[in-house]
A protein has these predicted regions:
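Catalytic alpha/beta core domains of metabolic enzymes, predominantly
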Residues: 1-101
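C-terminal extensions of enzymes
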Residues: 99-166
Length: 166
């Protein structure tokens, strides 16, 4: 089997983080358990659509914010990026059973609630929910970009301070 030469990443945890903030900001009454599943539901759809259309493209699950962003991906032919502190260390500590959760069907009631109550879930989940020109301004993408930019600027600042001490 040849490894993929092209990969794409779904920012599962950042997507959940954004939706949680959107629900709080807009006063959306939605179950925390439903929100907990949102990013994984989108990841499953993106994964399956891509595997059907372009089976050689690899999948990376990124932006993990909780253990579920790793454990719910078990069974997928995917690479998952996680932090050591708060994720990898907790997985080692809890040693949960290894169960293929990725191929479990999505609960239709959960999907319906997300599609009905969360506009940016619907936009990210539905085919053609956002257009290419809208992508850059899509809330979860902005959150990812802004988080990355902030962390990069902090790294540059730290490097500059350390060089100044030499």
């Amino acid at each position: 089997r040849t490894a993929p030469v092209v990969y794409f990443s779904h920012i599962t945890g950042i997507y959940d983080e954004y939706l949680g903030k959107q629900a709080a900001r807009e006063g959306i009454d939605i179950s925390p358990d439903t929100l907990w599943q949102a990013g994984i539901i989108v990841a499953k759809k993106a994964y399956h659509l891509t595997k059907r259309a372009c089976p050689a493209v690899g999948f990376i699950g990124g932006g993990a914010r909780g253990l579920q962003h790793f454990t719910e991906m078990v069974g997928a032919n995917a690479c998952i990026t996680i932090n050591w502190q708060g994720t990898a260390d907790k997985l080692l500590e809890t040693n949960p059973p290894v169960v293929d959760r990725f191929h479990a069907p999505v609960d239709e009631a959960v999907l319906d609630e997300l599609l009905t109550k969360m506009p940016d879930f619907r936009r990210g989940y539905m085919l053609n929910g956002i257009t290419p020109p809208e992508y850059e301004g899509f809330g979860p993408v902005e959150l990812f970009r802004d988080s990355f930019t902030s962390a990069w600027e902090n790294a540059r600042k730290l490097a500059k301070e350390r060089r100044a001490k030499q």
